[in-house]
Every structure is written in structure tokens, then in C-alpha cells.
Amino acid sequence: MVREGNAESCFRMRLWCIAVLGLALLSACFIVSCVVTYYFTHGNTGKRLSELHTHHSNLTCFSEGTRVTEKIWGCCPGTWKPFGSSCYFISSEENFWAKSEQNCIGMGAHLVVINTETEQDFIIQQLNKTFSYFLGLSDPQGNGNWQWIDQTPYKENVRFWHQNEPNFSAEECASVVFWDGRGWGWNDVFCDSKRKSICEMKKIYL
């Protein structure tokens, strides 16, 4: 009976050791995961902030909810308009499409990419009906294969062309423009025509 008791005690001890070892391994994995997550989250955020500060003198941040223990802040350059996960800048200069994109890149952004109707509605509220504004949408080959500047898929269900547009293959760039009786909509235009433009960049989250 004593031997059986000792054997049972040894068996329980082994189980306990295995459980402790397993718990230790899980804890180690959790710690490593937290360190990696912190590095990528804060490291990338710091890098992005550094990049933005080379183009913009100040940032404006807005509370956008909370994590488990802290608030989430979404930040945009001071003169930019925040919406969703992006920041938008309406250029007052008129340039060719390529120059407009170059100017956006110089600010750490790109010509605007419109993904939803709510985004389109927000953007047109910021615009002057007198002007036409370049979008980050073009048809480089003039064959109807429209492409967004950031490689976002050109969605069939997210298009806001004016009626009967696009209608001319030589007009290989897109703009958003207000037409009397029709309101705001997209229009294909010559890329070397001069227009205002809209830049977009992702918010910085702190």
C-alpha cells in the first residue's frame, strides 16, 4: 500500500510539473507577443510621426474611443480635415494631375481614393462648387481600366460618375465636379488640364 501511495504521489507530482511548465511556456509566449505588438504599434507610430513632422509643423488629435486601459487618439496635420481613418487636404493650387499627385506625396499623402458613399459625401461638403478637383483615379491606357493611385480595387458598386461619364478615352484622369441640375459627380478629364486637387493620408493613432 505504501508503494502504491508513493507511485500515486509521483504521478501527481509529474502532472503538477507538466502543468507548471505549460503555464510558464504560455506566459512566455504571451510576454513575447506583447513585446512584439508594442514594438510594431509604437515603433511604427513613432516612425510615422517622425515622417509627418518633416512635412507638417503641427498635428491635431481627437479622442476616438478607448483601449482596455487608455484612450485612442487619431491625429491629422493641423490644416487637414479628419474623417474615418483618414485625413484630407483640399489644395488651393491648380496643377496637372501628375503634379497634383507629386504635391500630395510631398506632404506624405496621395490623391484621394474614395471607398464609400459616406466618404464621397464628406468630401464634397468641403469643396467649392466653382472648381473641379482631381481624384487619385486614372485610366493610363485609355482602355476603360480605371485604377486608384494606391492600388485599391476599382469597385463596381462604388462609382459616382456623372451620367454618361466617362465618355472619352483620351481623358485619362478623373475629377469630381459640380454640375447645375446634376450636383456633384465624377468626370473624366485630360490629365494635363489644370485643376485643384484633394490629398488623403491615413490618420496616426496614439
UniProtKB/Swiss-Prot annotation:
<dbReference type="GO" id="GO:0009897">
    <property type="term" value="C:external side of plasma membrane"/>
</dbReference>
<feature type="binding site">
    <location>
        <position position="167"/>
    </location>
    <ligand>
        <name>Ca(2+) 2</name>
    </ligand>
</feature>
<protein>
    <recommendedName>
        <fullName>C-type lectin domain family 6 member A</fullName>
    </recommendedName>
</protein>
<feature type="disulfide bond">
    <location>
        <begin position="76"/>
        <end position="87"/>
    </location>
</feature>
<feature type="glycosylation site" description="N-linked (GlcNAc...) asparagine">
    <location>
        <position position="128"/>
    </location>
</feature>
<dbReference type="InterPro" id="IPR033989">
    <property type="entry name" value="CD209-like_CTLD"/>
</dbReference>
<dbReference type="GO" id="GO:0002250">
    <property type="term" value="P:adaptive immune response"/>
</dbReference>
<feature type="glycosylation site" description="N-linked (GlcNAc...) asparagine">
    <location>
        <position position="167"/>
    </location>
</feature>
<keyword id="KW-0430">Lectin</keyword>
<dbReference type="GO" id="GO:0005537">
    <property type="term" value="F:D-mannose binding"/>
</dbReference>
<keyword id="KW-1003">Cell membrane</keyword>
<comment type="function">
    <text>Calcium-dependent lectin that acts as a pattern recognition receptor (PRR) of the innate immune system: specifically recognizes and binds alpha-mannans on C.albicans hypheas. Binding of C.albicans alpha-mannans to this receptor complex leads to phosphorylation of the immunoreceptor tyrosine-based activation motif (ITAM) of FCER1G, triggering activation of SYK, CARD9 and NF-kappa-B, consequently driving maturation of antigen-presenting cells and shaping antigen-specific priming of T-cells toward effector T-helper 1 and T-helper 17 cell subtypes.</text>
</comment>
<feature type="binding site">
    <location>
        <position position="171"/>
    </location>
    <ligand>
        <name>Ca(2+) 2</name>
    </ligand>
</feature>
<dbReference type="Pfam" id="PF00059">
    <property type="entry name" value="Lectin_C"/>
</dbReference>
<keyword id="KW-0325">Glycoprotein</keyword>
<keyword id="KW-0472">Membrane</keyword>
<dbReference type="GO" id="GO:2000318">
    <property type="term" value="P:positive regulation of T-helper 17 type immune response"/>
</dbReference>
<keyword id="KW-0391">Immunity</keyword>
<dbReference type="InterPro" id="IPR001304">
    <property type="entry name" value="C-type_lectin-like"/>
</dbReference>
<keyword id="KW-0735">Signal-anchor</keyword>
<feature type="binding site">
    <location>
        <position position="179"/>
    </location>
    <ligand>
        <name>alpha-D-mannopyranose</name>
    </ligand>
</feature>
<dbReference type="GO" id="GO:0050832">
    <property type="term" value="P:defense response to fungus"/>
</dbReference>
<feature type="glycosylation site" description="N-linked (GlcNAc...) asparagine">
    <location>
        <position position="58"/>
    </location>
</feature>
<feature type="binding site">
    <location>
        <begin position="187"/>
        <end position="188"/>
    </location>
    <ligand>
        <name>alpha-D-mannopyranose</name>
    </ligand>
</feature>
<feature type="binding site">
    <location>
        <position position="165"/>
    </location>
    <ligand>
        <name>Ca(2+) 2</name>
    </ligand>
</feature>
<keyword id="KW-0399">Innate immunity</keyword>
<keyword id="KW-1064">Adaptive immunity</keyword>
<feature type="topological domain" description="Cytoplasmic">
    <location>
        <begin position="1"/>
        <end position="15"/>
    </location>
</feature>
<feature type="binding site">
    <location>
        <position position="195"/>
    </location>
    <ligand>
        <name>alpha-D-mannopyranose</name>
    </ligand>
</feature>
<dbReference type="InterPro" id="IPR018378">
    <property type="entry name" value="C-type_lectin_CS"/>
</dbReference>
<keyword id="KW-0812">Transmembrane</keyword>
<feature type="binding site">
    <location>
        <position position="200"/>
    </location>
    <ligand>
        <name>Ca(2+) 1</name>
    </ligand>
</feature>
<dbReference type="InterPro" id="IPR016186">
    <property type="entry name" value="C-type_lectin-like/link_sf"/>
</dbReference>
<dbReference type="GO" id="GO:0043123">
    <property type="term" value="P:positive regulation of canonical NF-kappaB signal transduction"/>
</dbReference>
<dbReference type="InterPro" id="IPR050111">
    <property type="entry name" value="C-type_lectin/snaclec_domain"/>
</dbReference>
<dbReference type="GO" id="GO:0045087">
    <property type="term" value="P:innate immune response"/>
</dbReference>
<feature type="transmembrane region" description="Helical; Signal-anchor for type II membrane protein">
    <location>
        <begin position="16"/>
        <end position="36"/>
    </location>
</feature>
<comment type="subunit">
    <text>Associated with FCER1G. Heterodimer with CLEC4D; this heterodimer forms a pattern recognition receptor (PRR) against fungal infection.</text>
</comment>
<feature type="disulfide bond">
    <location>
        <begin position="104"/>
        <end position="199"/>
    </location>
</feature>
<feature type="binding site">
    <location>
        <position position="113"/>
    </location>
    <ligand>
        <name>Ca(2+) 1</name>
    </ligand>
</feature>
<dbReference type="InterPro" id="IPR016187">
    <property type="entry name" value="CTDL_fold"/>
</dbReference>
<feature type="domain" description="C-type lectin">
    <location>
        <begin position="83"/>
        <end position="200"/>
    </location>
</feature>
